[in-house]
UniProtKB/Swiss-Prot annotation:
GO terms for molecular function: nicotinate phosphoribosyltransferase activity. The modification Phosphohistidine is found at H225. This is Nicotinate phosphoribosyltransferase. Signal peptide: none annotated. It comes from the Bacteria. Pathway: Cofactor biosynthesis; NAD(+) biosynthesis; nicotinate D-ribonucleotide from nicotinate: step 1/1. Pfam families: NAPRTase, NAPRTase_N. Catalyzes the synthesis of beta-nicotinate D-ribonucleotide from nicotinate and 5-phospho-D-ribose 1-phosphate at the expense of ATP. Keywords: Ligase, Phosphoprotein, Pyridine nucleotide biosynthesis. SUPFAM superfamilies: Nicotinate/Quinolinate PRTase C-terminal domain-like (SSF51690), Nicotinate/Quinolinate PRTase N-terminal domain-like (SSF54675).
Amino acid sequence: MSPIIHSLLDTDLYKFTMLQVVLHKFPQTHSVYHFRCRNLEDTVYPLVDILDDLNEQLDHLCNLKYKEDELQYLRKLRFIKSDFVDYLELFQLKRRFIHASIDEEGRLDIRIEGPMVQAMMFEIFVLAIVNELYFSRIKTDEVWAEGERRLQAKLELIQQYEKSQQPNDPPFLVSDFGTRRRYSFEWQKHVVAAFHNTVPNVFRGTSNVLLAKELNITPIGTMAHEFLQAFQALDVRLRDFQKAALETWVQEYRGDLGIALTDVVGMDAFLRDFDLYFAKLFDGLRHDSGDPYEWGDKAYAHYRKLKIDTKTKMLTFSDGLNLPKAWELHQYFKDRFQVSFGIGTNLTNDMGQTPLNIVLKLVECNGQSVAKISDSPGKTMTDNDTFLAYLRQVFQIEELDEAI
């Protein structure tokens, strides 16, 4: 079977930006990540059928190392430190830290346990492998043709949006955030190249570092939930974990990579911690769950209360978007904020087949549970309901959904 992952750059930029902070600030952290498929009822065949192929792909993944040209590319990114690239030169994923099996209920189970500087780098690779293995068994020429038809329709739609823009209108900016849910690497590259070549004034870049390198476009990304969640188990009061995470980020990047993620314990709790200091230091906020209009209006009110000009701040939306949703949000917020959009599944896996809704999330750090309390029912995730209840209590969050 041919390898699915050919390069350790075939992952999202924020894996590198988060790993650099972990390596510099808390390198001894131990972590556990757990796989979930949120729509098992929609699968054409049982996911467990890919288990043997998955294990073979993991064996290959753990043989990969960074090539010299890849390291040189990373060195050119101004926020990547030279000692971090030196670490990556020695880096290799260790097979003993990841286990794929069938759980007691007959579902595909993937568990990663080991040093966070190792464990956190598996996620995007594994999700991309699971997707490609699953869809390769139901691939037909008709599927690719339908994907191409939908891609061309998207490009035509963006060109219509461009024509409707007035000369002084703020730009409509879209990025590819679809590595983890892609149909295949080949398809993602095709989509990203098509957007880059056809609508270069709209297409801002891709989260995929390998594609950014190969196509000479901007790699996009800052932080994910796992970075903030880890601080729930580090040496700070639980009530202060968000402030500690944001402060650590600021100390590492000194003004670079300034988009903060708001929904680890919900937007309201985030804004209570996002004081004048952070509001001035960070360039903006990323939306990843809950009603995006309500969220953006809350951000607007918060910045206004702090007497900050919202036109100097960026709102990035990345939750289950397609182009019409993004365009409507752009119209709503464009006169108050700079706005950008990260589109994932709808760009890289819109083929007429039901995409897998799969995640591989941090559930434990240093022997202690961590959790995400999303602004969307169903996206909350933990392996420990007792800790989840305590976290809700500490941050005064009503129970709207159950952890999955």
